[in-house]
């Protein structure tokens, strides 16, 4: 047993260490606080979104695919469940509302606010369209002469990403929305003038389904960006948060190691005395673990609390581009993360305390024999630099720690800048690459003469089962030539397609029409400069590149907005403005995420560089005092202890830049690799100067601070 007097003295020693190393504890506190907050808010928030969406898809029976057929399907197929999806579009004042008849089995809608439809004078619309167009529940809308009351908002699994077309990256709720009405209302609105397709659920793959239902067109849900995009956009930030958390816990371990190494070094004589006096290991363990455990616990409590309050904000962060179903926090995961986040830092601390204090052994000073090594090269290096090189060689762990911390901070900063600049360039390129004003997708049986550039759009599968957009254009195309001289028979891919799939001029393209089980092979002879979409362009003046049974959508590109009141032959429209604003919407979301990551990176770089340089300075005090007494100037002392730090830091940041480029590519591909849209990672070298500048500026500030402290020794 330890008497009360000893306990009081131990408490005083603990408080003295807290006061002496208060800045180090502040650094540890900030890193643990940030780590816990990010883990709880981002990981739990994004995981909860993913779980809510997947549960919604399951409960409301998301499709496994869709198909179009010219035949009425009455028979029931084995292993396939079907439902006809009916929709019509109302276009007024540049805005389009796609109205669906309520579904009974597949892609059923969920009412997210208000109430469900009760009569044929009511309508449900999606929440984002409601907000973007400044509407409210109980407002009335007039569609095709029918007044309908908005009684609620709703969304279905196939339209969480509520975008007009798969050709755009993100939704634009100001100009496009969806709505649901009952069967009677739908009949009054559209009569027989509506579009339809079949949604199906099945465990069979798309080719097997195609053989059974014999459609004119078929596509599976894996290639439906309206379904997959929201899932990818939840998974990528979740995985990023998990990776970031793991790296931050590594930093926590490093900071605790630095602290315990420094304290145990100063406490070596006291530890030897305590052992001789008979203090058992448990008493010493409790004594030396007290201040760090207290710091970790407070940081965990505050970080966890703030993280919990931020979960809802994180969950709704992408709500402006996705019409989410009702989202619920995964409280089981939250509890597990809270327990794990506390356990991991305490375990790290316990292990380090045991390693540095309990396994303590008094090191005996051994006189090492000096072996003189002659080096002709070293003789030409000034003594101050030779001394620095010797210190680096003898303190390899210190230099390794410096490189790791600089690399980690550089990784965060470069990742943020690269992601922001890449998406910004993507938005700018959307404006320059899309020079048409509007595209009209026509309903083949009801085509009427529209003046514009005609082309056909095919959706065919590649070797990996990914749907590719194939445009059949004329050699006189002005909207799709992209500064190339087109010739009949050209097979052209975009630069984005080349970057994504590694294809180049001379390579073969293998495409499959799963509807008719037709295989097509083409040899690429040109690559255009388009970087925003991974499209294929086939040039044919007679429009014949595929078997006549292969399904295509005829379309017309216009130089001016279509303002003809007669739109009976138009299946859907896509404006240039929709394409551009879809990119701007995602840029807004990316900017919010980047602001958070950059803020974290700046706090970390200040905290880590301070901790690292302070650690290096404390380990150098004896040599600095000795060398100062021998007459070395302050400038020489700085060289002897901190030379080569700047070039090493610069090279490390460049290395982190190269890895960040890979990280951004992986991050973007995880969200949208299967989509036609493509965001190219920027080649802007100014990012290297910006990230280097930020870190070098902070590093210089702390070096000046240490220089002033060396003056006073």
Segments predicted by a language model, with ranges:
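Membrane transport/envelope proteins' first extracytoplasmic loop
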Residues: 1-253, 262, 419-420, 425-440, ...
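N-terminal Sec/SRP start-transfer signal
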Residues: 1-37, 289, 293, 369-410, ...
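Interfacial "coupling" helices/loops that link adjacent transmembrane helices in transporter permeases
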Residues: 13, 21, 254-293, 607-647
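Juxtamembrane segments of multi-pass membrane proteins
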Residues: 67, 76, 381-500, 504-507, ...
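Hydrophobic alpha-helical segments
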Residues: 225-240, 263-366
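Short helix-loop junctions at transmembrane helix boundaries
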Residues: 301-336, 651-713
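Short cytosolic juxtamembrane segments of multi-pass membrane proteins
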Residues: 357-372, 622, 707-713
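C-terminal transmembrane helical bundles of large multi-pass transporters
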Residues: 570-669, 673-680, 693, 697, ...
């Amino acid at each position: 047993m330890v008497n009360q007097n000893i306990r009081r003295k131990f408490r005083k020693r603990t408080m003295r260490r807290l006061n002496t190393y208060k800045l180090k504890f502040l650094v540890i506190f900030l890193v643990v606080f940030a780590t816990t907050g990010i883990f709880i808010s981002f990981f739990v928030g994004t995981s909860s979104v993913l779980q809510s969406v997947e549960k919604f898809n399951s409960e409301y029976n998301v499709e496994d695919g869709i198909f179009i057929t010219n035949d009425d399907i009455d028979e029931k197929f084995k292993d396939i469940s079907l439902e006809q999806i009916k929709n019509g579009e109302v276009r007024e004042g540049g805005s389009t509302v796609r109205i669906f008849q309520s579904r009974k089995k597949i892609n059923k809608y969920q009412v997210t606010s208000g109430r469900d439809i009760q009569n044929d004078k009511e309508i449900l619309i999606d929440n984002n369209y409601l907000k973007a167009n400044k509407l409210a529940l109980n407002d009335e809308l007039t569609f095709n002469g029918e007044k309908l009351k908005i009684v609620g908002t709703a969304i279905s699994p196939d339209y969480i990403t509520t975008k007009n077309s798969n050709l755009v990256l993100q939704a634009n709720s100001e100009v496009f929305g969806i709505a649901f009405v009952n069967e009677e209302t739908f009949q009054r609105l559209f009569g027989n003038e509506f579009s339809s397709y079949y949604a199906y659920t099945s465990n069979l793959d798309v080719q097997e389904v195609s053989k059974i239902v014999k459609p004119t067109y078929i596509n599976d849900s894996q290639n439906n960006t309206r379904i997959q995009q929201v899932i990818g956009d939840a998974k990528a930030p979740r995985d990023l948060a998990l990776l970031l958390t793991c790296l931050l816990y590594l930093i926590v371990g490093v900071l605790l190691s630095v602290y315990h190494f420094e304290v145990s070094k100063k406490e070596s004589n006291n530890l030897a005395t305590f052992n001789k006096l008979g203090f058992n290991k448990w008493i010493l363990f409790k004594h030396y673990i007290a201040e760090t455990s207290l710091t970790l616990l407070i940081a965990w409590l505050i970080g966890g609390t703030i993280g919990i309050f931020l979960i809802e904000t994180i969950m709704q962060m992408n709500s402006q581009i996705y019409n989410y179903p009702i989202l619920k926090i995964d409280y089981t995961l939250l509890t597990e993360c809270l327990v794990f986040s506390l356990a991991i830092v305490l375990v790290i601390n316990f292990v380090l305390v045991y390693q540095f204090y309990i396994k303590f052994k008094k090191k005996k000073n051994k006189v090492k024999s000096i072996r003189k090594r002659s080096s002709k090269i070293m003789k030409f290096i000034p003594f101050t630099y030779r001394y620095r090189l010797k210190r680096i060689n003898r303190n390899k762990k210190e230099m390794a720690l410096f490189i790791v911390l600089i690399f980690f901070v550089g990784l965060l900063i470069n990742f943020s800048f690269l992601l922001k600049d890449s998406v910004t360039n993507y938005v700018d390129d959307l404006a320059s690459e899309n020079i048409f004003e509007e595209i009209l997708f026509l309903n083949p049986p009801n085509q009427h003469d529209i003046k514009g550039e005609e082309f056909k759009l095919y959706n065919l599968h590649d070797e990996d089962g990914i749907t590719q957009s194939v445009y059949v254009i004329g050699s006189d195309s002005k909207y799709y030539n992209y500064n190339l001289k087109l010739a009949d028979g050209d097979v052209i891919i975009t630069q984005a397609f080349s970057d994504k799939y590694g294809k180049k001029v001379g390579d073969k393209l293998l495409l499959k029409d799963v509807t008719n089980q037709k295989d097509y092979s083409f040899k690429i002879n040109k690559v255009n400069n388009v970087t925003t979409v991974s499209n294929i362009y086939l040039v044919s003046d007679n429009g014949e590149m595929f078997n006549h049974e292969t399904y295509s959508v005829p379309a017309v590109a216009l130089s001016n907005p279509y303002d003809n009141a007669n739109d009976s032959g138009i299946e859907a429209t896509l404006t240039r403005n929709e394409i551009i604003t879809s990119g701007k919407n995602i840029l807004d979301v990316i900017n919010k995420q980047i602001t958070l990551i950059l803020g974290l990176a700046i706090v970390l770089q200040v905290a880590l560089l301070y901790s690292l340089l302070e650690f290096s300075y404390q380990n150098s005090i004896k040599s600095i005092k000795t060398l100062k007494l021998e007459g070395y100037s302050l400038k020489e002392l700085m060289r002897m202890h901190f030379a080569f730090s700047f070039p090493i830091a610069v090279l490390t940041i460049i290395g982190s830049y190269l890895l960040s480029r890979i990280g951004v590519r992986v991050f973007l591909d995880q969200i949208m690799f299967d989509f036609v849209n493509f965001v190219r990672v920027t080649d802007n070298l100014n990012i290297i100067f910006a990230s280097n500048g930020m870190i070098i500026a902070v590093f210089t500030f702390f070096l000046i601070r240490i220089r002033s402290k060396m003056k006073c020794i």
